Amino acid sequence: HPVENAGLTHARGAAEGFFLTVDMCPSSKPFEAGFFAALAARAARDGRAMPVAISISGYWALDHAAEFASLIERQRLGQLDITWVNHSYAHRYVRGVPDRENFLLLPHTDFEQEVLRTEQLLIARGLTPSVFFRFPGLVSNERLMATLRRLGLVPLGADAWLAKLQKPRPGSIVLVHGNGNEPFGIHEARHYLADATQRWLPLNEALAG
């Protein structure tokens, strides 16, 4: 049975802030450079690195090497406090196929390799993969979830996908796409970023019970 939005969608305990997650699915478009610059500007205003979880797909990283390098550089400069989330390697998607049969549920998908190849890519760049895995399309099933548990990873969902007009509340895991494919979500996120009273928290804190 397909499962949608399984896993961690909200902080397990009380959290006085939001958790920003930015998905980088494969895309032919330039990434949201202005948005990442706005995150860096927020960091400068706050006097601390802006916490953000970035979900990296292998194909995006390979096709957008300079953009990927710019994110790593923002981390090195102390502008962004990045939690590197695994978002699969190929992130296959077939237009016209229902979501419940699409993404990692497509035939001939080697799920374990989809996970491990992205981990290897991150490590090769000197990055530390986090314990989090975000399913493409937020679509999984019981078999994939069992494999993920065996690999020791935590499935990451979201309860505030901004492009779907889901409103965050304290403890929300906020989802936007930074790959240029969902500009409306980025537009919505800018409203929350402009609020100087809104706290943004590192994703690991969402696991605290």
Q: Where in this protein do the model-derived segments appear?
A:
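C-terminal active-site subregion of NodB/CE4 polysaccharide deacetylases
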Residues: H1-F36, I123-R125, V139-G209
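Active-site beta->alpha N-cap acidic-glycine motif
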Residues: H1-W84, P129
